[in-house]
């Protein structure tokens, strides 16, 4: 089978500052949205020209230190009509901050910080391993959220394997307003693996260390997760987007047992 050819076109931006994510709104506008870790989102045209004012500025809410900051952006599949988009950031509450997943509403090339509706708040026990990516599933339209194991090193709380912790997970929620028009602003898809059993309803898969970035194959729906390793292996996990997958941390790092763990039932990278 012949492999397809891939080409790249250089995209030069002006005055980037800690850019951590880049996406589009899928609204036919051709706009490119660049996320800066300090708490701003800018719009660029396809020639690399930036708007004079940011699309969103929540720098006053964001803790920009180490791995923390504004980390993810996803546009609602119906953004062209409802103006909804979602962000993932670490706030300034407490010594290590909280992960916030929030919805905002855009009007034209701007979104007011006052339009924030907070969907999820996850306390962070340490100052690292925050995950941060968010995407809508191309086949189900649900919002997926990656979370790190809570930090330090070696997952001292074994949070990634715990089904009562949101850390070290891929979460999956339904943010359609029809599903739940009131707080908390989302509902649980009925086919989430722990929706009717022990474990947090929001969990889709688990056993992740710091899934800083993930994405979907838009055609097949397959899931690709980049998971930061402890000391010997980095991971790229590629699977069908199936419920309840255990990616192994902190029992496995890549293909290797971690710290003498001999568990089973893990999906290797």
Task: Please place each PLM-identified region on the residue numbering.
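Beta-propeller domain segments
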Residues: 27, 35-38, 60, 68-70, ...
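Acidic, Gly/Ser/Thr-rich repeat motifs that build Ca2+-stabilized beta-propeller blades
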Residues: 1-154, 213-229, 267
């Amino acid at each position: 089978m012949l492999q397809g050819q891939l080409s790249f076109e250089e995209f030069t931006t002006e005055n980037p500052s800690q850019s951590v994510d880049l996406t589009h709104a899928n609204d036919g506008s051709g706009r490119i949205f660049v996320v800066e870790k300090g708490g701003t989102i800018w719009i660029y045209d396809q020639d690399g020209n930036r708007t004079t004012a940011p699309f969103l500025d929540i720098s006053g809410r964001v803790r920009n230190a180490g791995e923390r900051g504004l980390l993810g952006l996803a546009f609602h599949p119906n953004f062209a009509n409802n103006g909804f988009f979602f962000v993932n950031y670490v706030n300034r509450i407490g010594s290590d901050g909280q992960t916030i997943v929030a919805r905002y509403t855009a009007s034209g090339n701007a979104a007011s910080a006052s339009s924030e509706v907070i969907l999820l708040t996850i306390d962070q026990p340490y100052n690292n391993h925050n995950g941060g990516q968010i995407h809508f599933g191309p086949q189900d339209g649900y919002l997926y959220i990656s979370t790190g194991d809570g930090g330090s090193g070696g997952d001292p709380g074994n949070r990634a394997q715990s089904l009562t912790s949101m850390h070290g997970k891929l979460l999956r929620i339904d943010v359609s307003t029809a599903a739940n028009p009131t707080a908390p602003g989302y509902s649980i898809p009925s086919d989430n693996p722990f929706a009717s059993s022990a474990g947090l309803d929001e969990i889709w898969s688990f056993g992740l260390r710091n899934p800083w970035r993930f994405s979907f194959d838009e055609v097949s729906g397959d899931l690709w997760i980049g998971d930061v390793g402890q000391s010997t292996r980095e991971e790229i996990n590629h699977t069908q987007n199936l419920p309840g997958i255990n990616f192994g941390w902190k029992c496995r790092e890549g293909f290797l047992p971690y710290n003498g763990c001999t568990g089973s039932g893990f999906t290797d990278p």
